[in-house]
Amino acid sequence: MAGASVKVAVRVRPFNARETSQDAKCVVSMQGNTTSIINPKQSKDAPKSFTFDYSYWSHTSVEDPQFASQQQVYRDIGEEMLLHAFEGYNVCIFAYGQTGAGKSYTMMGRQEPGQQGIVPQLCEDLFSRVNVNQSAQLSYSVEVSYMEIYCERVRDLLNPKSRGSLRVREHPILGPYVQDLSKLAVTSYADIADLMDCGNKARTVAATNMNETSSRSHAVFTIVFTQRSHDQLTGLDSEKVSKISLVDLAGSERADSSGARGMRLKEGANINKSLTTLGKVISALADLQSKKRKSDFIPYRDSVLTWLLKENLGGNSRTAMIAALSPADINYEETLSTLRYADRTKQIRCNAVINEDPNARLIRELQEEVARLRDLLMAQGLSASALGGLKVEEGSPGGVLPPASSPPAPASPSSPPPHNGELEPSFSPSAEPQIGPEEAMERLQETEKIIAELNETWEEKLRKTEALRMEREALLAEMGVAVREDGGTVGVFSPKKTPHLVNLNEDPLMSECLLYHIKDGVTRVGQVDVDIKLTGQFIREQHCLFRSIPQPDGEVMVTLEPCEGAETYVNGKLVTEPLVLKSGNRIVMGKNHVFRFNHPEQARLERERGVPPPPGPPSEPVDWNFAQKELLEQQGIDIKLEMEKRLQDLENQYRKEKEEADLLLEQQRLYADSDSGEDSDKRSCEESWRLISSLREQLPPTTVQNIVKRCGLPSSGKRRAPRRVYQIPQRRRLQGKDPRWATMADLKMQAVKEICYEVALADFRHGRAEIEALAALKMRELCRTYGKPEGPGDAWRAVARDVWDTVGEEEGCGGGGGGSEEGARGAEVEDLRAHIDKLTGILQEVKLQNSSKDRELQALRDRMLRMERVIPLTQDLEDDNDESGLVTWAPPEGPEAVEETVPNDHSPAVRPTSPPLSSWERVSRLMEEDPAFRRGRLRWLKQEQLRLQGLQGAGGRGGGLRRPPARFVPPHDCKLRFPFKSNPQHRESWPGMGSGEAPAPQPPEEVTVPPAPPNRRPPSPRRPHRSRRNSLDGGSRSRGGGSTQPEPQHLRPQKHNGYPQQPQPSPAQRPGPRYPPYTTPPRMRRQRSAPDLKESGAAV
């Protein structure tokens, strides 16, 4: 039996009164073991299918041949689990589903014949088999315990002395257990039924007094079943101990539909914690089965429920789960979530072993070996007389026992039985860490308690059980709860004549569980010195009294008289004066105690008289919901308005917290060391996750989406730049943990946060396929960033599931993770489609980015061409010089003549051999190294351009021809040089930038010398190629003669490949000038030197 999977069954219930009143439609269908569900908002889509071990159709009546009754559910699940218990295995059955889905009905049932649940039927069948199989060599003992887990606190329901929360501990051999939990001995099914009823009463009283809800607490009913057998041949006694755990989990309830607030929100948070932790444990165990590595951490201790169920979930147990479903379309989301939960559970495998003594195990193995050898010898033709005197006994397994003369040696006590399918490590005192005296004393006391319980005899356990029963009855009698005449408290019996009160509770299991008699005369209700004792909020010491007075005709009239200041309501109306009660009236005392008044004799007399029933309760049942609705209607409170008010309060709270988060993010952005976009997005993501997760604990995903859409997400005020596809991902800093020690669980949590943030930024427009694609990509990116192995292939599914549970998904895009082949194929197609869509989006984004880059490059080329047309060139360019990539300016005549070679942007400059550092290189170095020099040169260049623009305008007005510039095509793969490294404002300030394309330059046929302006010297015809002078042209070091002699060889222009060019004719030998001569402005000739008075004397 080792390594068996968890058995999973689903059961759909009929419509309840609320669903019938809303004309709900059934969206669940079953065919064999396959369960399908249809999205009511997307009815054209294919249904989502799930396959389980059992699918029970209980939506219709008994007349339907497909109807699954309580007996059928027990035959399929209960009998199999009981058989495993007799074999010596631990057994667990737990029910899961939303509130009102039928969990308690499946587990507990009702008192009517044929309506009993799994727990009563299993207990009754247990004692039936015990009575049949009991003999002198085989004896049985049964002990039970009943506890409740509410708000992470454990409460003992069978011990009236247990007031506070019990402590959960874990023993290295016994496993998790509840300290001081009472285990009571029982001898019949009646005893078990008595204890179950007492536990339910205690649960009801505590829940009503403390304003708790039973559906918000987990109930665990445990049966310890021991089988003792005596072997007459060996004289050894052996035991097999089975623990049967029957769990009724709390239902999931939506805060918006219940109007939960205050304490209810805290309860919901704790229930969400337990159920969420249970889901995480189930997911981790399911992932554990799909890979070889077995060292993953299972978060059992995150909640009390999972800690106590540690052995039942993936441990030493045979486990079955029953998922209760609602068929209504208004509960589609909860039903689909339950189906996915159950589908995940069926992947868990438990390693169950038989819990027996080592001696019994050894004897059983030897008997099986002897039987095998005997069959082998018999198959070879040997007779029974030749088998060595082996004796056959009917009751032994295999029918063979070893000879009595040689009994097997007992097993060594140093080898304990297996635990969870593996051998327990030996605990030596030297290996244990050093502990303090207080912890040592605590361990000693706990060990002594365990030893005392193990050594306690059966008679002592029975006496203890009887003492606790007497204490419970005394406590109930003190509270005014009615008991039977024989002292038993099994069920709720209705007196035939006596008027009485029956409690009503939100949980159907706890409703009509307590009965209070109204005796003749006066019956007082309150907290102190009363006949019916009630506690809780708004219950006064003397709250009210019931006066029972017989009438002359034999009828007993009961009058309710409230005390001053006590809140007492009858049929929803506040009572301040004495009021005669009628049978069926609803009475509310305080805020939590709800009763229904029953008067059997009065009802019988009215039926005999033919009195028509009063227009009180309608056809719907008179239960707790009806009483609460009636109370609110009578007080003028609209439930829908209250729900809207509650939602508005939550929205205002979210808005306030968002404003605080915005202020905090803004401060962090202003004062933090790093102000990069990654850090800003990271802080916004953390704050958004904090607000969304806190809001999700109180509201469903759809309501969370609406609130976030209206209010927005926290932001630091910094514009969020879109992330490029080719952007290198930066390492994220995990909150509160060193990234080197990040685990896979931390990466999953980080992925959930970031995906929820992205989905919220996109206004929750992501569907299921998109969320799955994001989860897969995010997990792969995080694993690669932190150097972690990607682990199992379906790790992203857990991330996607957490995202669905937190922010939901777009309507119509949800899909089921069903177990059928069609569902799996559909999920695969959706995955491929999502992957293709993602790749298409990536390619489109890359294309857009490349197009933008091309547009930027084209704009730069056009801008450089426009600048080229504006800036005049003073050098005559020839075709050969253009091919060489150099521009040579002809020196002017005179002592200040200079010749320098200036490189263009096509090729690097040719450095002369002498002097060692040219003026161009010196200027370039200063521009790169000296910021002050760079600013001054840029400022000077702008001034010169403005002056040159003014001179050109004056020359144009004088009728002169403007020299067309040479065409210069900037390189595509070369870094821009000065002056294009200046700021954009400087480039836009140059003249001609805003104009359109200038016409291509055409060389004129004749050269026209522009007339000289007044008071200026006309240009000399002997110097048509004079260059512009400035203060950085080398000064006197570069002055040469005024003759136009040929250039030295080392100063001649070179080609890119190093080959020299052919000698070019001088300007004087050319047939005509290529461009018109250029006149140098007088004020631009010298900057730092004194003016040349000799040359300028004529002009002056």
Curated annotation (Swiss-Prot):
Residues 5-348 form the Kinesin motor domain. The keyword Membrane does not apply. Pfam families: FHA, Kinesin, Kinesin_assoc. The modification Phosphothreonine is found at residue 1080. Residues 1089-1100 have a biased composition (Basic and acidic residues). It comes from the Eukaryota. The modification Omega-N-methylarginine is found at residue 1039. Keywords: ATP-binding, Coiled coil, Cytoplasm, Cytoskeleton, Methylation, Microtubule, Motor protein, Nucleotide-binding, Phosphoprotein. Residues 404-419, 1000-1018, 1062-1080 have a biased composition (Pro residues). Residues 359-381, 438-479, 634-671, 827-871 form a coiled coil. Residues 952-961 have a biased composition (Gly residues). GO terms for cellular component: Golgi apparatus; microtubule. SMART domains: KISc. Signal peptide: none annotated. Residues 1019-1029 have a biased composition (Basic residues). InterPro entries: FHA_dom, Kinesin_assoc, Kinesin_motor_CS, Kinesin_motor_dom, Kinesin_motor_dom_sf, P-loop_NTPase, SMAD_FHA_dom_sf. One of its GO terms (molecular function) is microtubule binding. Residues 523-590 form the FHA domain. The modification Phosphoserine is found at residues 295, 494, 674, 676, 914, 1031, 1089. Its main location: cytoplasm. GO terms for biological process: microtubule-based movement; retrograde vesicle-mediated transport, Golgi to endoplasmic reticulum. Belongs to the TRAFAC class myosin-kinesin ATPase superfamily. Kinesin family. Unc-104 subfamily. Monomer. PANTHER family: KINESIN-LIKE PROTEIN KIF1C ISOFORM X1, STAR-RELATED LIPID TRANSFER PROTEIN 9. This is Kinesin-like protein KIF1C. It comes from Mus musculus (Mouse).
